[in-house]
Amino acid sequence: MANSSSVYDWFQERLEIQDITDDVTSKYVPPHVNIFYCLGGITLVCFLIQFATGFAMTFYYKPTVTQAYNSVSYLMTDVSFGWLIRSVHRWSASMMVLMLILHVFRVYLTGGFKRPRELTWVTGVVMAVITVAFGVTGYSLPWDQVGYWAVKIVSGVPAAIPVIGDFMVELLRGGESVGQSTLTRFYSLHTFVLPWSLAVFMLMHFLMIRKQGISGPL
């Protein structure tokens, strides 16, 4: 017991752990806060589940047009609890989108976007866009008929934009047509670019909430 106390004292002297703990655990919660104010936190939990299950699947998934579908089939049928990992990933993705939509509605209806919380709202909107991008890129990774044609349609949408439309289509596809380069880019976006982008904006979002507190009632 004395050893654990001395270890704690060592860290306390250098990092002031107790002050951090007191700040986290003693934050004032306004009396008007109810269960609907937990929707943002539930969205965060869904993201963490997505991260954990997605990381687990990267050990088996092969991002090539010839092996992607078979690797997903192998995960679902031969890997122990692979079906459960992928199913939880898919279910938590749907839950994350639903909780995000409800969270946006709650913030809007309670006026949480108003001054001085405009930047908190902006970071939230950016995270909503990133979440949609997660869905689009993840949908394609099994590289089945549904995934292939979804990518072909989605990546072709920017073609309607004047001047830069064709360039954006080629940037998304990695060439003139949908193929290996497209799958590689979508896989990179889904497993690296988007998660880190979302994590950065989440940190900004939470720090601003921490600084400004929860918005008051209507």
Curated annotation (Swiss-Prot):
The chain crosses the membrane at residues 35-55, 93-113, 119-139, 189-209. The keyword Electron transport applies. Its cofactor is heme b; heme c. CDD domains: Cytochrome_b_N. Keywords: Electron transport, Heme, Iron, Membrane, Metal-binding, Photosynthesis, Thylakoid, Transmembrane, Transmembrane helix, Transport. Component of the cytochrome b6-f complex, which mediates electron transfer between photosystem II (PSII) and photosystem I (PSI), cyclic electron flow around PSI, and state transitions. NCBIfam families: PRK03735.1. This is Cytochrome b6. It comes from Prochlorococcus marinus (strain MIT 9312).
